[in-house]
Amino acid sequence: MAAAEVPVPSGYFTQIKEQKLKPGDLEEEKEEDGVQRVEAQEGVVKEVEAENSCLLLEARAPVESDRRILTLQTVHLESQDVHLQGLGWLSVPHSEELSGTVPEAEGILQLPSVLWLDPEPQLSLQHCVTVSIPEELYPPEELQRIHFHLLRENVLMAEENPELTPDLDESTALKKPEEDEKDQLPPQGETDKREERLLLLEMKPKEGKDDEIVLTISHLSLEEQQDPPAANQTSVPGAKAAKPKRRRQTKGKPQSFQCDTCPFTSSKLSTFNRHIKIHSNERPHLCHLCLKAFRTVTLLRNHVNTHTGTRPHKCRDCDMAFVTSGELVRHRRYKHTYEKPFKCSLCKYASVEASKMKRHIRSHTGERPFQCCQCAYASRDSYKLKRHMRTHSGEKPYECPTCHVRFTQSGTMKIHIAQKHGENVPKYECPHCATIIARKSDLRVHLRNLHSQSPEEMKCRYCPAGFHERYALIQHQRTHKNEKKFKCKQCDYACKQERCLKAHMRMHTGEKPFSCLACNKHFRQKQLLTVHLRKYHDPNFVPNLHLCLKCDKRFSRWSNLQRHRKKCDPEHETLAPNKDRRPVTRTQASEGEAGHKEGEPQCPGEQALGHQGEAAGSQSPDHGLTCEIIFNMMDK
């Protein structure tokens, strides 16, 4: 048979218990629950050695002195395979083409089986047959999932004639007749046209006893049909969608389950069920702390450990502990075993993690699936795209603990700390350009990026010159430093760098690619976005206003103050900023002059300006300029 068969060891006995039916008692029981259960008083034990591991019970006509035995055979087929393959046949000369209507059972997976029974008047009543099966053969937990139902297929009925009763040794296996055997069957018109009866068999554990099964036999309505449905077109109504495809189990090879969505195959049902949840959107397991849902209990347990701080997976080589086993395996590969199981088939690259190998493969294929939504940038992995998006938002999450300078990338901050604040950090000098680098790894990157010879010629952006070394190209392009090669086609604007021209062209196109994530404002330049974030969305921002000593007008930038003083007081000498590039305010300037000229009185003009500045500084917000008014003026 094409379906996988469940082996039944020879030597097991199946005990059939049946009691003579009393119509009165059966009618009372039928009114209660529709299923009569009869206590077994007499038993017949018969050993069946089946070649194909099928259970066969011989059928006889009910004689008063004989025990009544039902002819019953079950065929173990694939539980999830709705389309039947290779349905067996009985070698009986008289046959009729019949089909049964299978009722739909709610919540029960209908499994295919074949059942035939000799017709007799007692069949109008529902029978109950109790079969005792050893627990070693069918464990109770498996019996709860076994249900046998009738298939839509040709079923042959056994006659009351003992000569037509199938032999035990010859009919244990259901065989489909060959072409020459079909010719020996009598024509359909010659068969005795009478009402045939077919039964539905259900298998479930008996109440109170786990080692016995109750077979409930019910009637099914039958109809004659001209052409029997094909074996491969047989379907059971109400059956659920097929999940695992169970392959045929051969000798020496374990049974395997194959996924219908992807090529995944597993020999364990538990592993297969865990894989099936990957294709499902159901997340039934909910975290009671943050209400986050997960597909499996294992994922939920690992997530709860992050809340409680539990780290059950401990490294045996050090004192480190981790939440998941995957983190422990990755730690051991990086720190102890140095194993790199993922190797590239195109080069000598090897990686500890599969994700890094997938990212490396994209360097060969040129694929960049992660695209920036605000510019033409594309990356091979999501991390670099996230880092690039900070250039649009102006976010700088990394801060130097010494000088509080902020950076977009953590690597840039580490280089800054090593070069600016490292006291005993060794310095590495480049042998080609005398550049001093703090870390040896950064020196290797410097040599690879700037001083390695490229097979392709790199063209200068300003002239047709070409170079094979990036450092030589950079040095050459510096010769064009004072040349304004980039000119605007719509106005007379010219600049030295291409990026400045791109920023200028946004004035003509109206493009504002830099947006604030807090208030959804858009800006043409990144610097304007940075100033906006610092002014309006930084709670620790303290405005540093620069005061004009002549008109008491305040400015947030030193350059704006210098531009204003050229118009306001062209004869006055501009104050230069100090070494720290901090703006020199009017108060600082007066204090500095007082420090240099202690005991000398100020000139009348300076004294008047000083009193005027103090008066302006002491004004209340109702009579003077507030910070909010100044910011609004700056935006205008």
Curated annotation (Swiss-Prot):
This is Transcriptional repressor CTCFL. One of its GO terms (cellular component) is nucleus. GO terms for biological process: establishment of protein localization to chromatin; genomic imprinting; transcription initiation-coupled chromatin remodeling. Residues 242-251 have a biased composition (Basic residues). Transmembrane segments: none annotated. SMART domains: ZnF_C2H2. Residues 17-38, 160-195, 222-257, 562-624 are annotated as: Disordered. It is found in: Cytoplasm; Nucleus. It holds the Pfam family zf-C2H2. InterPro entries: Znf-C2H2_CTCF (IPR056438), Znf_C2H2_sf (IPR036236), Znf_C2H2_type (IPR013087). The lineage of its organism: Eukaryota, Metazoa, Chordata, Craniata, Vertebrata. Belongs to the CTCF zinc-finger protein family. The gene is Ctcfl. Residues 568-583 have a biased composition (Basic and acidic residues). A zinc finger (C2H2-type) spans 257-279, 285-307, 313-336, 342-364, 370-392, 398-421, 428-451, 458-480, 486-508, 514-537, 546-572. Interacts with histones, PRMT7 and SETD1A. Interacts (via N-terminus) with BAG6/BAT3. One of its GO terms (molecular function) is DNA-binding transcription activator activity, RNA polymerase II-specific. Residues 160-170 have a biased composition (Acidic residues). Keywords: Chromatin regulator, Cytoplasm, DNA-binding, Metal-binding, Nucleus, Repeat, Repressor, Transcription, Transcription regulation, Tumor suppressor, Zinc, Zinc-finger. It comes from the Eukaryota. Testis-specific. Testis-specific DNA binding protein responsible for insulator function, nuclear architecture and transcriptional control, which probably acts by recruiting epigenetic chromatin modifiers. Plays a key role in gene imprinting in male germline, by participating in the establishment of differential methylation at the IGF2/H19 imprinted control region (ICR). Directly binds the unmethylated H19 ICR and recruits the PRMT7 methyltransferase, leading to methylate histone H4 'Arg-3' to form H4R3sme2. This probably leads to recruit de novo DNA methyltransferases at these sites.
